[in-house]
Amino acid sequence: MSLNFLATRFTCSWPWSTMVLLCDGRLVCGCADPYGKRVLGDLRVMPTVSSVWTGEIASQLRRDIGSGGSKFCGDCPLKLPLKKDEPPPHRPVDAGVLPSRLYIECTAACNISCNQACCAPETGITRTRQAGMLDYDLFTRVVDETGPTLGRIDFFNYGEAFLHKRALDMVEYIKAHFPHVYLYTSTNGLAFSEDGARRLARSGIDEVTFSIDGARQDSYVRYRQRGDFSKAIRNLAALADEKRRTGGDVPFINWRYILFTHNDADDEMDLARRSAAEIGVDRLCWEITDHPEDMFSRRFVPGTADYARIENEIWDKSYLGNAIPGATPRARIEVGGSSWLDRIGNAPIKGISGQPIAISTRVTNLSARPFPARASYGRRLVRLGAQLCAADGTLIDRDYERAWLPSSLPAGKTVEIVMTLKAPDSPGRYRLKFDLVSEGIDWFEQAGSPTTTKDFIVG
């Protein structure tokens, strides 16, 4: 378990970007506050989200963190400890009028009891809220105020969001009024019917995660107590089927599977891989945990050979890694200079300072899924990227240049791309590192895909 909560000198970026709306109308500053102990304001008595975001409590919190810590944060695990004598990052107290990201908690209640979880019904979490369900009018008020400037809404916090009888209405409201907002939710998949899952697929929501920890009922229910594996899988399948039927590229569908001692055998993990592929989910990932103490997987502890084998399939290791066979994106990138002959001897790329240079490349899709060249929601489209590095490999500019794929690149196929970039203004020796990037998600290298690096001589 992370010991960040023990830090007395720390930093944190959340108060500059994010707020969490609890189901009773109070606003807290982070998603790791199950019992609502760090309240910034209460929208039942305060007029606007902005009045909370720019208010004295939030402003003082930013001042304190800018000085190296705040008592307000208490045991929050989101704290990032500072090293001895390390100065805290300098950020202005003025964080703008509104946050750029918002979590919305519909309810703290849940329809199952996850073994020893901090939000299980037995913990009394619902008694820490002053209302059982989020008021719909309060919801629309908050979304109407913040929507124009939000980049993302996470439609969940503690509890199961879709227990709220108007949860699907809320999802549809957000996407109808603020289609630019990236809308994400996480669910156990048990609170709606198959028709509800299909409605969710049609809502325009950008990404949905189903948490299903097992490939059979007997192992699944060990952690998701009172859960129904068959129902969760049926709803997951209905969501994926409706996405296929409508022909859209959203929602992106994740199956997240926490590894425990009772569900981490190869046969069960392979069954999950096959099921995910058959259902048609976009991504299956394993989650590594260190609790409950008597349940977490010892087999996949970081540093073990088994962990290394699935490292690129782990939920928070890479946002592109995928346990479905062939679904992790991999590419081969061949790079020439001004002609294909340059590739024969690995000749350096040469340019004139401040002048454009055209670089010929060949990109081959080594995975089993196509690389999309376009996306309706501006994410997960794939482009070729060039990262500028010093001669010793030190990164100078990760986003130095991009080039579009001419069209979606099918599995096993190759495309020629000419990238035009401007040479640095200062002559010298550099290096260019080429990789593909899933825009808004991650570089392919983070999921284990090979990159290509070329010397870059600028005269």
Task: Name each model-derived stretch.
Residues T420-G428:
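Short, surface-exposed loop/turn segments at beta-strand-coil junctions that are enriched for proline
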Residues M1-P47, S51, E105, R129, ...:
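Radical SAM enzyme [4Fe-4S]-AdoMet core and its adjacent flexible, acidic
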Residues S2-P15, S50-Y103:
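N-terminal [4Fe-4S]-dependent radical SAM core
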Residues K37-L40, L80-E207, R222, R234:
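Conserved alpha-helical substructure of the radical SAM core
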Residues F371-A375, G440-T451:
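Beta-sandwich strand segments
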Residues W340-L341, L381-R383, C389-L405, G448:
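Short beta-strand and strand-turn-strand segments in soluble, beta-rich domains
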